[in-house]
Amino acid sequence: MADDGMLLNFSIPETGILSRPSLKGGNWRDRAAAKKAAQNWHTKASARLTGEKVDKVAKKTVENATDVNRTQLGQRTRRASKSPEVHEDIDRPAKRARVSGDFRPKSNEKSAAEAGDYRPQINPGATQKPSERQSAPKGAKGGKQVISSLFTYNPTSTTKTQAPEKRHDEEPIEPSNAPLSSELDTFTSLGISTTLAAHLLKKMDLKAPTAIQKAAITQLVKDDSDAFIQAETGSGKTLAYLLPIVQRLMELSANMKKHKDDDAVQRNSGLFAIIMAPTRELSKQIALVLEKLLGCAHWLVATTVIGGEKKKSEKARLRKGINILVATPGRLADHLEHTEALDVSNVRWLVLDEGDRLMELGFEQEIQKIVGALNLRMRGNKTRIPGLPDKRTTVLCSATMKMDVERLGQISLKDAVHLRADPTEREQEGDEPQDERSYAPAQLKQSYAVVAPKLRLVSLIAYLKRAFTRKGSVMKAIVFVSCADSVDFHFDILTSNLEEKNEKAEGTKDDTEEKADDDEPKKSTKKPKAIPQADPTKLSVTHAESPVLSPKSHAVTAYRLHGSLQQSLRTSTLAHFTKNNDAAVLIATDVASRGLDLPNVDLVVEFDPAFAREDHLHRIGRTARAGRDGRACIFLMPGPEEGYVDILKTDRKDNEAGITITRQDADDILTRGLVTSGIATKNAYMDIAQDLQLNVERWALASPARLESARRAFQSHIRAYATHVADERKYFDIKSLHLGHLAKAFALRERPSGMKAPGLRTGAGRNDRTPAKIRGANAAKIGSAPAAKKAVDLDIPDAKDTEEAAKMRKAVRAREKFMRHAGMADEFNLG
């Protein structure tokens, strides 16, 4: 070296020379894991050589790397610059090594914190010992927990927020489903008797008919032809077909009394009308309206036969005699086959309510069987009853004219008259329909909220808190979600006290206040107190006070409703929600979207968009009924879902095009709902929302049952997301979902790919609550019994439900097969 005139000065660092392995080949995930392991080994080896602590060595390594980059870049800048105006002491901004996804230079850390930037600076557990890292609480078995901020790396909206146009000459919107205001349009002018009209006014507070009631009553009272009633939700279709039936039966009874004083229509006179509805809840509601209507004709008797009830008690009521029957198709077909006391030879009216839903639920075969049985038994009875139609009159009610509804009309209708709200639109069957679409009520105020996946949960809570802030501003609200598991999860959150100190999981701290400490934290020897919380897998409580939503001035009651609840619980929940005169919120699936007339519902929130446009219209139709005002809001995520706004705009008729659908952002919702008092800073809502999210996550981690409920809700939500109709799947593409961000909306800190799939909910897919031993004994008896005796003696209320469950399982298996071929089996754990 010296012979060449060169002198090299090697400076060996204090830590010595440690070899760094070169990682090549293999998968990029394996290389990243090996690189991280080598870096941790190098840090610990340096700490052993210098005697310093691990975190200090890691910090020094980052600073040295930053200094080297600054020197090299500064020298390179000075060499490249030839201008004398450039000062040599001005270097290029420092370039720091990227650590844990931090893209900002070190010099900007302070300004970012002051500006309210919540992006993570450095991974607090990257240089900690295993004993110093945050341990997973009990019940959180599985993958590594990820605690991320709500306001980092959220997708940006693809549409721009437009300020609403102010129209000074805007006229008030007239309700499209309100009762007619003309003095000439009364029930008596339509052919209703004064006795029945007075009863409607005094007992039911109905002064005038709606447009669809006027068209239907005029036709059905005077004519015996079949009819197809098409009208928007909340327009009074139930009374449109009930009033003509009751009026004709009252006239029949009056005519019979004229000939014989003791002769009149009684319960043993025969069954004259059958009303079929797709769901049990709608059947119960129709029966309730019919019971009020028959208050002026006490000699007429009506009853219901629906799934989930005891067949023995239903048979007893049928033996006593009835005049009007409200039923679901599956149970009615079963009684027609096995109950001899059910005589349908005198049936003169058959009503199919919500015809589109009847076909969607797969009741086509049952309806064909019922219509065939009615035709066969009516031919056998050739006795003519004066005052009744000579043939059976069939009435089909539906909000849309889809292909399946037309097929149902071909099965049941013959020479039907098409009735609409506008009498000028009446048309005979076979004419080309003028408009096959259905629309939302004109007075309904619609809006949509663009909310990032991570902000969905806190935004929903903030939106509802804002709605119930003032007493009387919103009496009742309905929140629609996609699946039953999601209903249970959100109900448990709203009815829990998230701010209780004893609900923190063992080993967790306030994540926003955790600081790195040199000493190891002392392990607590105290066991956490038992939390008096019911198992969320047991569906026994369906309503409770909501501490999360209740302001100081009044309490808010939360309810839940879905198809997996027992029929008795579903009925009692709806009854309690209907009779409650205080503020209340109902979290439900689409089981509450069809035909239910729930009073004082001022707000409908579609937290999960409906699977089809028709379901969306039925959801928002739970408010703004019978001329009342109402509001509806749908939550959409940034990206393809924002294109769904074009579908929302088709909810209005052409003459209502001036009515705009307003937009809301997550920032506005959180600010209005969470920042309630005092002078708040610009980003104050971020701190409150972050604390609320952490409270929900700690609440979920505090109990294995809650954590299982959250996982089940997340996975069921993903499966339901993949079931949108083909025409709308471009807006709801499951491949565009960020599963990790969406998991945070379900209070989960685990990676979706490492999440274990829990089992089915208690009783899911099966309504029989008998023990397994008894079910096995009954199955053995069934196998040895004759076929004829099996059909008559067995009381199996869920026979039809089992068949429907089999159809649903077949559809789910087909969906799972599609997901596996699409490469999504790892996220859903379906393989």
UniProtKB/Swiss-Prot annotation:
Gene Ontology CC annotations of this record: nucleolus
Reactions that this protein is recorded to catalyse: ATP + H2O = ADP + phosphate + H(+)
Keywords: ATP-binding, Helicase, Hydrolase, Nucleotide-binding, Nucleus, Ribosome biogenesis, RNA-binding, rRNA processing
Biased segments, Basic and acidic residues type: 82-112, 501-512
Motif (DEAD box): 353-356
Region (Disordered): 65-180, 419-441, 501-543
Pfam short name (any one): DEAD
Motif Q motif: where in chain: 185-214
Entry EC no(s): 3.6.4.13
Classification via InterPro entries: DEAD/DEAH_box_helicase_dom, Helicase_ATP-bd, Helicase_C-like, P-loop_NTPase, SPB4-like_CTE
Domain Helicase ATP-binding: 218-419
Residues reported in the UniProt entry to bind ATP: 231-238
Domain spans labelled Helicase C-terminal: 456-670
Domain of life: Eukaryota
A molecular-function term among this protein's GO annotations: RNA binding
Ranges annotated as biased composition (Polar residues): 65-75, 146-162
SMART domains: DEXDc, DUF4217, HELICc
Gene Ontology terms: biological process: endonucleolytic cleavage in ITS1 upstream of 5.8S rRNA from tricistronic rRNA transcript (SSU-rRNA, 5.8S rRNA, LSU-rRNA)
Cell compartment(s), UniProt: Nucleus, Nucleolus
Family from the record: Belongs to the DEAD box helicase family. DDX31/DBP7 subfamily.
Domain notes: The Q motif is unique to and characteristic of the DEAD box family of RNA helicases and controls ATP binding and hydrolysis.
Function text: ATP-binding RNA helicase involved in the biogenesis of 60S ribosomal subunits and is required for the normal formation of 25S and 5.8S rRNAs.
Protein name: ATP-dependent RNA helicase DBP7
